[in-house]
Regions:
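Auxiliary alpha/beta "docking" domains used to position bulky ligands
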Residues: 14-212
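TRNA-recognition modules of translation machinery and tRNA-sensing kinases, especially anticodon-binding
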Residues: 215
């Protein structure tokens, strides 16, 4: 037989898709990133491209026009930035969405009829989630920069970021009729955080809307 010359190429051919060495590296980085997120206490991690929610701005404008924001004037004041990740930070390419479960160990309604016990929302029974989630986000951000130098920003609830549509676009869950994100594994018991980065990471598939016919 005649030996064929060996040619080093920057990519390999798989089926009908050519995958570059950079894409291979980013895919491996993404898998490691998700494993690190789990190690830091996050129960969900997904990635969405920065332009994954083009309909969010229009929905926000309609919501504001109906006065649904009530006294939350800051929602209107920064609506332009809130509508899109790139409106907030033009350099962003990918958004890493993260969810940290705060599901209670028992049934929170079990004490509903106990009159000598106060009722405190489950999310408020522990430490301030802003501090807990942001600490984990910063740790994950440091890990990411150490593996692949990039610019990034972390967010948890206090910046003009539409976390729920982005989390749905990142495959973590879907936005239910009650407006909250619903995860098939964690329900609505998720604190959401985001890391915007200049890295072009492979995105996850958006989560389908699985709401039924309820009118709640």
């Amino acid at each position: 037989s005649i030996a064929k010359p060996c040619v080093n190429l920057p990519s390999f051919y798989l089926g009908a898709v050519t995958i570059s060495s950079q894409q291979q590296a980013n895919s491996a980085l993404t898998l490691a990133l998700k494993a690190e997120a789990r190690a830091l206490g996050f129960s969900a991690c997904g990635i969405a491209p920065a332009d994954a929610t083009p309909e969010a701005a229009a929905r926000l404008d309609a919501w504001l026009a109906e006065g649904m924001h009530g006294d939350m004037l800051w929602m209107e004041e920064r609506a332009g930035q809130r509508g899109s990740p790139r409106a907030l930070w033009p350099a962003v390419k990918s958004v890493v969405m993260l969810g940290m479960s705060y599901a209670p160990a028992g049934d929170p309604l079990a004490l509903a009829d106990v009159r000598d016990r106060g009722r405190i929302s489950v999310y408020a029974q522990g430490q301030d989630y802003h501090d807990i989630v942001k600490k984990a986000l910063k740790a994950l951000a440091r890990w990411l920069v150490s593996r692949s130098p990039c610019d990034l920003k972390v967010f948890v609830d206090t910046a003009p970021v539409m976390e729920k549509p982005l989390a749905a676009a990142a495959g973590i869950g879907w936005q239910g009729k009650h407006s909250n994100l619903v995860s098939r594994t964690d329900g609505s018991w998720l604190f959401l955080g985001a890391i915007m980065t200049t890295l072009d990471l492979p995105p996850d598939a958006p989560h389908a809307d699985r709401c039924g016919s309820c009118t709640a």
